[in-house]
Regions:
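Rossmann-like NAD(P)(H) cofactor-binding subdomain of soluble oxidoreductases
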Residues: 1-26
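Internal alpha-helical scaffold of NAD(P)-dependent oxidoreductase catalytic cores
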Residues: 3-8, 27-122
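Long, contiguous hydrophobic alpha-helical segments, chiefly transmembrane helices and signal peptides
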Residues: 13-18, 74-78, 82-84, 166, ...
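Glycine-rich beta-alpha junction loops
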Residues: 13-18, 39, 65-67, 79, ...
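Short, solvent-exposed polar/charged micro-motifs at secondary-structure junctions
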Residues: 19-23, 69-74, 133-135, 197-199
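Short amphipathic alpha-helical segments, especially helix-boundary/capping motifs
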Residues: 22-27, 55, 83-88, 146-152, ...
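NAD(P)-dependent Rossmann-like dehydrogenase/reductase catalytic/cofactor-binding core
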Residues: 108-111, 115-199
Length: 199
């Protein structure tokens, strides 16, 4: 925003996923979008309301998209490591509670680094990320992802078809961790187990 002060810049994250097959597109669209600007910018809540007014989308206005996207990376990358470990077949992990616990540990390491660097944990529902309740909620979520086609649609399809993007995201978030003196040993171990996929 500081680079382009005359521009009104918004960032958005839509909850949708899918993949292309030879004769069709398989997708899921949860009709939910998180959208907003960087912290400190002029509010766009009214404009966003006008844009999405009359649509079936549930719109979550987020005035701090930088922290939201940092947290998203800290949640998504450990899940991507699981996708790479299994060559995209998350069902191989559906009963591996120990590994899924490590995925959660890596997410917590990421959130801790983000919080300790002075950023907010977003969404706010994740703010108590070191609690047993958070761990149980995440474990249920990851077990569901590994046991159903949701894992393929919402995680492994994207991870397996966006290796360059995931590799860049991993490099960038690790640079952030390093610049802020964060320890992330579980993250690094899962990354190593992801093998040949990450570049």
């Amino acid at each position: 925003a500081a680079v382009l002060p005359e521009k009104n810049i918004l960032f958005a994250f839509a909850l949708s996923a899918g993949h292309r097959e030879p004769d069709r597109v398989v997708s899921i669209d949860l009709k939910k979008i998180t959208i907003g600007q960087l912290r400190g910018a002029v509010s766009n809540a009214e404009l966003i309301g006008e844009i999405f007014g009359g649509t079936k989308y549930k719109v979550v206005y987020e005035p701090n998209m930088e922290d939201y996207l940092l947290c998203h990376a800290a949640f998504v990358m450990p899940a991507a490591f699981a996708c790479y470990k299994t060559d995209g077949d998350l069902k191989k992990l559906r009963r591996n509670t120990v590994y899924l616990g490590r995925v959660i540990d890596a997410n917590i390491e990421g959130y801790r680094a983000i919080r300790n660097a002075g950023h907010d944990i977003l969404p706010k529902a994740d703010a108590d990320f070191e609690s047993e309740k958070y761990r149980k909620t995440c474990l249920r979520f990851f077990k569901l992802m590994c046991a159903t086609s949701l894992g393929k649609l919402c995680a492994s399809d994207h991870a397996m078809n966006a290796i360059d993007e995931m590799s860049a995201l991993n490099r960038d978030i690790k640079r952030f961790f390093d610049e802020n003196g964060a320890a992330y040993p579980v993250w690094q171990a899962l990354e190593a187990e992801a093998g040949r996929y990450l570049r």
